[in-house]
Amino acid sequence: MVHIMFNQAAQELTTIRDILRFAVSRFNEAGLFFGHGTDNAHDEAAYLILHTLNLPLDMLAPYLDAKLLEAEKEEVLAVIERRAVEHIPAAYLTHQAWQGEFDFYVDERVIIPRSFIYELLGDGLRPWIEYDELVHNALDLCTGSGCLAIQMAHHYPDAQIDAVDVSLDALEVAGINVEDYGLEERIRLIHTDLFEGLEGTYDLIVSNPPYVDAESVELLPEEYLHEPELALGSGADGLDATRQILLNAAKFLNPKGVLLVEIGHNRDVLEAAYPELPFTWLETSGGDGFVFLLTREQLLGEE
């Protein structure tokens, strides 16, 4: 029935306005989850249409009444159908994901960038890192697409950055993005599990590790099932990876070095597990309970 409807759309719809309305109706009908870039059916449909037609992503209105060629219409409707029927996140259909002013290549080898950490780099880490030039060596654990490593290179122009992931597939995607930004000389991609085998020390360590607990993994919307499970689940309480980071980070931080970790909705569980650690919870667009900061000295119990 759905495929018949799309065939009918190909025959009867003519303008971008027509196809936008059709897409929004189909997305709502399909009960899609929006959380990988947009938060509603209209914006998702507009993005997919504009991207597929190679139009500016911020200029929908001037093109609403433009008629499409049959080949263009076929291509746009094919993308809309895949989003509606297969629940594939838009970023995997376009192979593009945005974080702030940066865009990255993505595919199903990596999770779609959505960490709040990027909002905190630079000014957001003062007074712990008073000047960006004080960061000479930085580490991105669980780098995935390499998005945070690339943004660290932007904010900390004097820094050499190690970007680590246990997934070779993810590192291949990170390599594409590092090359796209011309940062091969500043970002080193390393295949390892967290700190294993690392020898350097760092002024800043950031990580957006897996943090979804086992029960929540089973309840994730269908869209998340297209993402690598390795990058989502982290044990019964979602803290397996974070525990390893807290156990080892101090050994890899320079004096006054900073650890920045995102943990999703696990703040209460984490604080209950580590009552002795003086976590600082930083304000992001998602709230103040998603990203914590600790210094090397705090991890060692020296302050």
Swiss-Prot record:
GO biological process entries: methylation
Any one Gene Ontology cellular component term annotated for this protein: cytosol
Reaction it catalyzes: L-glutaminyl-[ribosomal protein uL3] + S-adenosyl-L-methionine = N(5)-methyl-L-glutaminyl-[ribosomal protein uL3] + S-adenosyl-L-homocysteine + H(+)
UniProt cross-references to Pfam families, sorted A to Z: MTS (PF05175)
Assigned protein family: Belongs to the protein N5-glutamine methyltransferase family. PrmB subfamily.
Function: Methylates large ribosomal subunit protein uL3 on a specific glutamine residue.
Alphabetized NCBIfam families for the sequence: hemK_fam (TIGR00536), L3_gln_methyl (TIGR03533)
Record's protein name: Ribosomal protein uL3 glutamine methyltransferase
Biological source species: Neisseria meningitidis serogroup B (strain ATCC BAA-335 / MC58)
